[in-house]
């Protein structure tokens, strides 16, 4: 508790935690004030993300950057999963797929590029474990193939999705989950020594006790998920007020807010010259969404969805995911980065965001 109070005094950003109960009070008093709920939920997620960042760094200091990055990605992706489950129950499969594709693109381009930029502005050249980065990029590329196949098959068909497409998506979902499990076994158990993080100078602040850090990770992640539910309920109506298209909302806004906790950890790690942690969070989170979250949602759609969901994405989403994956694989292949590399990656993300923002609704 003393460590938490010290963090509150040290980081003024955490005073925004007052907006967390404010979100639920506002929802209770006026659930139709969507624009107000949208703004409050965003302000509430920011300090929760900062708190989660420090807790994750404390766990990483005790367990190593690989395990710390995996743990942060797992808890951070709970937000995306909760958002998708809410849309899944109501049958909003387009929103589910947009949030999945958007999360992959945001992690591989925005989070990775911003980490390279922020770290490079403070440190001339940074190094990271390229073996771990190559594994995550390879897993992500294989998942992209699984997303591409049903979409290619669908182009050759006419009419509504066939039983073949759904059966193929079901089989691919099981296969992807198996591959993800084997990837974790490879990196965390049988070949763990290949993924050991390089030694870096410690931060200015001592890490929290492991028990407090784990409890904070779990508790704050739950709060982020709850606030994100309020966010997703209000974001569509609020988007109209701000002039945003539905495609931009699902692909960009939901992904940015849902991944805020992971981004805070990745950016902080990059500034402290712990780029292994940043790359592990960005690529680990993206591969986990593609290999675990997406297929899990397909399986859960048979239980809680009005109809089974498939892995058929619209062509533009598949192309963006494929380009993002190839870009991430290219920039992480050498195991070194500088600030200009981050700029180049961010430019690709801005191109996608600009396209989706200006995309006519009829073309989505």
Where are each of the predicted segments found?
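Hydrophobic alpha-helical segments, chiefly the membrane-spanning helices
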Residues: 1-364
């Amino acid at each position: 508790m003393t460590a938490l109070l010290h963090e509150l005094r040290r980081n003024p950003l955490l005073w925004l935690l007052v907006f967390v109960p404010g979100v639920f009070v506002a929802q209770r008093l006026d659930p139709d004030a969507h624009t107000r709920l949208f703004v409050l939920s965003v302000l509430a997620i920011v300090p929760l993300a900062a708190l989660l960042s420090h807790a994750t760094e404390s766990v990483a200091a005790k367990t190593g950057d690989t395990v710390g990055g995996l743990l942060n990605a797992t808890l951070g992706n709970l937000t995306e999963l909760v958002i998708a489950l809410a849309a899944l129950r109501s049958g909003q499969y387009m929103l589910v797929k947009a949030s999945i594709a958007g999360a992959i693109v945001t992690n591989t381009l925005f989070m990775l590029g911003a980490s390279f930029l922020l770290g490079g502005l403070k440190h001339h050249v940074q190094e990271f474990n390229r073996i771990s980065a190559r594994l995550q990029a390879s897993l992500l590329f294989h998942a992209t193939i699984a997303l591409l196949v049903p979409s290619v098959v669908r182009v050759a068909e006419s009419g509504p999705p066939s039983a073949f497409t759904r059966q193929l998506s079901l089989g691919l979902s099981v296969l992807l989950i198996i591959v993800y499990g084997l990837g974790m076994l490879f990196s965390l158990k049988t070949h763990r020594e290949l993924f050991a993080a390089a030694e870096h100078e410690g931060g200015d602040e001592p890490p929290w006790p492991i028990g407090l850090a784990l409890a904070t990770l779990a508790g704050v992640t739950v709060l982020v998920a709850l606030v994100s539910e309020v966010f997703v309920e209000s974001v569509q109506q609020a988007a109209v007020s701000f002039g945003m298209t539905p495609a931009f909302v699902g692909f960009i806004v939901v992904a940015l807010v849902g991944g805020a906790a992971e981004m805070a950890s990745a950016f902080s790690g990059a500034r402290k010259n712990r780029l292994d942690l940043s790359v592990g969070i960005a690529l680990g989170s993206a591969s986990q969404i593609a290999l675990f979250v997406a297929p899990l949602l397909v399986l859960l759609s048979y239980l809680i969805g009005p109809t089974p969901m498939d892995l058929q994405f619209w062509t533009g989403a598949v192309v963006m995911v494929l380009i993002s994956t190839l870009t991430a694989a290219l920039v992480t292949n050498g195991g070194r980065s500088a600030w200009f590399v981050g700029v180049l990656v961010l430019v690709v993300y801005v191109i996608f965001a600009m396209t989706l923002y200006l995309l006519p609704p009829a073309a989505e």
